[in-house]
Amino acid sequence: AQTVEVKMGADGGLLVFEPAKAGPHNVVFDEDNIPPGV
């Protein structure tokens, strides 16, 4: 499982939704495109 950090507001103090700086997240499960290490 991947650890996801959820924060209230951005690092700059703005109250906005800012995903943690990471690679793109695929919500749809694609069994033909499983990333290595899974």
From Swiss-Prot:
Residues 1-38 form the Plastocyanin-like domain. One of its GO terms (molecular function) is metal ion binding. Its cofactor is Cu(2+). Cu cation binds at residue 25. Its main location: plastid. GO terms for cellular component: chloroplast thylakoid membrane. It is found in: Plastid, Chloroplast thylakoid membrane. The keyword Nucleus does not apply. Keywords: Chloroplast, Copper, Electron transport, Membrane, Metal-binding, Plastid, Thylakoid, Transport. It is a peripheral membrane protein. Participates in electron transfer between P700 and the cytochrome b6-f complex in photosystem I. Belongs to the plastocyanin family. This is Plastocyanin. It comes from Thalassiosira oceanica (Marine diatom).
